[in-house]
Amino acid sequence: TKDMMNEMGAAFAVTWLVFGYTVWTGDAMMSETELVGIGMGGGLMAVAALAVVWMAFAGAHILPPVTWMHMMTGELDDTDAWMANGLKLAMQIVGGGLALVTMAQLNPDGVTYDESMTEMVDGVATVMAMDAYSFDEMRLLGGIAAGAILWCIHSKTDNPWAMSIGVIAMASYIGAEGSTDMASMLMNKMGDLVPTLLAYLEAGLAVGLGAMLAMKIDENLD
């Protein structure tokens, strides 16, 4: 549908413009790396790029935390809404994946998944697995708090610039790059499926719970 294509296009754009793609500055594994793109730490440029994408793709959630907030603050027994939002999450992953594939074709010196996971073990370059998922209570609480703040920004301002500032400021707490991380993992043999998926779900649920909490508090204050 048009909404799903809009979501995919928005995810493609934000992955390309903001998240970027890491490349080698020289020979692979022998040189430094640099980011082609603005990056989430790009300050005002990142805020501006994200705001422009939100305005250009009006109606798209673009980022997983925004979709999770809508899921958890809507009617929880509305299966149609859950399916629609689930499709949005899927299209965000597809859009991010398409952007990664395109950037890889345009940047032959890009860092591959295996290269990014390679470490020297006894003098031998060894591809390592991602660390196993471990539950962190403070990380969960941080996600809930960030979700509550982000929902207040989203519901009270309805302003892409305000949302962009909130997302960039709290990116590490809300799993802003979750869809691109999922896309990267799925396109690379799914070797780190479990830790990547669990981190993605934890961040989404934490942000969603935070948004629900903020909504309930706001309702009780009226």
Q: How would you name each of these model-derived features?
A:
Residues 1-222:
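Membrane-interface helix-loop junctions and terminal tails of multi-pass membrane proteins
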